[in-house]
Every structure is written in C-alpha cells, then in structure tokens.
C-alpha cells in the first residue's frame, strides 16, 4: 500500500498551539486567522504521500479578510437582534411570548444560513491552497448547491430527531468528494445511506446498553466505512481507499486521549489532536498498484460550465472561520 503518513509531534504542536491561543486571546481573536494558517502549514508539512510532504500555500492576509467578514456578519446580526429586543421592550413593556419564539426561529435560520457559507469558504481556502509535488488541489463546489443541501439536511435531521442524519451525511460526503480535485484525480463517495443508518442505529442502541463502551466499536465502523467507500478515479482507472483500523487501536486512541486531556487539565489537548490526526491519516491507504507519479496537474480537460446565475454563487463571500 502507498501509505499516507503523518509524522507530527505533540510537543511541536503544543508550542505552536499554545502561542496561537495566547495571541488570539490577547488580540481579541484578531490573530486567530494567523493561527489557522500557521497550524495548517505545520500539519500539511508533516503529512506525506509516497514520501513527499503536502504544502499549504495559504496567506494570513486572505484568512484575515475572510474571518473579518464572519465577524462583521455576526456583529450586524447581534446589533439587529438587540435593537429589536429594545424596541419590543419599549413598545410592550417586555418581550412577548410570540417574540421569544420568533427570535429563536430567526437565530436558528441565521445559523442554518451561515454554516454552509463558512464550510464553503473554508474549503475554498484550505483545499485550493494545498499542493503536493507542485500538483494543486481544487474545490469546484457551488455555494447555492451546498446551501440547499445543508439547510434541507439540517432541518430534516431536527424534525426526525436525528434519524435523517445518516442520509444527510451521505449526501454531503458525496457532494464534497465530487467537487474536490487533486490534479488529474477525481473523487466520489459510494457509501449507502441505509448502511450508514444501520451503523448509527446499532451504535446508538448498543451504546445505551453498554453505557457508552460500544462507542469504540462504532467509531471504528464509521471510520473504516467512510474510508473504504471513498472512490478515486484517474481516467479509466478506479480504486477505493482502504482502512483496516482495529478495535484495539481505536480503544488506545479514544481512551488515551480522554485520559490525556483529563489528567493534564486540558494541557494535553494538542497531543490528543496529534494522536487523532495521526490515526486518521496513517490508516488511510492507497493501493500499491497505483502509480503516484501518474498524478499530474490539471491533466483532465473538463467541459467549461456556464457561470452560475444564482445570487449566492455570484456573492461567493469566502468566509473563513
């Protein structure tokens, strides 16, 4: 197998993480975008495929501009909500019951709207600024399509008390995979919503019976299923990524991370992140028969699509958080 490999060290990441947290706190989060870029550069540089490390080329200035847009939207929304509450108090001598429910719906609608916008912006920033052997990654997703998928999926998940989440996550994975490019490589997701639901249902029921202990097996099943149903295409070639993570490895990861964070009163969080990242990367394998040297930058000529006329795609704010 051509292993993806992560060689990051907990102590190195702790130093980076500790400084970034302090600077973000002192600067009232204004240096948070700089922290995102610094951490991405470190994590990418410690992740390799076929012995060659990935490279993150994103700029702090671009991340800062995207983050400031998020803050601006949040400030405007909060100011509007506060003004509305003050007007209601002045008009009615308090906040009517109907207004409380209305405000809750407005807040929910804002969250449902802003979430896919931020996901879209993050994908644009992090995917498009990732390179491997000078081969650039790209993200082709349209915000209008992601918005429709996200709002519908989240609302149905809420209305069905979480039952629809398996269908929503499967659709979301398929959308994201099909819109990510790795040079001449194309991706898709072949997972089944029904099979995902079966894994979730089994995990939920056995998790209750075993007082949460079965979550270890559930994590293993979800991870292996997701990786093993990720399909990679290059021309006429097609293969699935592979993972055979076992229960012992997952137990050591989850229990070890929980103890690490609890015993150190949170200071072990960076080490826990590195352990999780190492597990996720190192258990994702590419078939040995696939020639990594065949990956070329923009090898496949795709049909030009007409620019979307949807206002969301024209706006395309590229928020980053």
Predicted feature locations:
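Membrane-interface extramembranous regions at the lipid-water interface
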Residues: 1-18, 34-69, 121-153, 168-201, ...
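Membrane-anchoring/interfacial helices and their immediately flanking loops
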Residues: 2-27, 31, 85-94
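Hydrophobic, aromatic-rich membrane-embedded alpha-helical segments
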Residues: 18-38, 150-170, 204-221, 258-275
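Hydrophobic alpha-helical transmembrane segments of multi-pass integral membrane proteins
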Residues: 20-23, 32, 66-82, 106-118, ...
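Residue-level signal for secondary-structure boundary elements
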Residues: 26, 30, 51, 76, ...
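Membrane-helix interface segments in multi-pass membrane proteins
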Residues: 77-114, 219, 223, 227-228, ...
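Short, amphipathic alpha-helical segments
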Residues: 93-104, 112, 116, 120, ...
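Long, low-complexity, intrinsically disordered cytosolic termini of multi-pass membrane proteins
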Residues: 264, 301-321
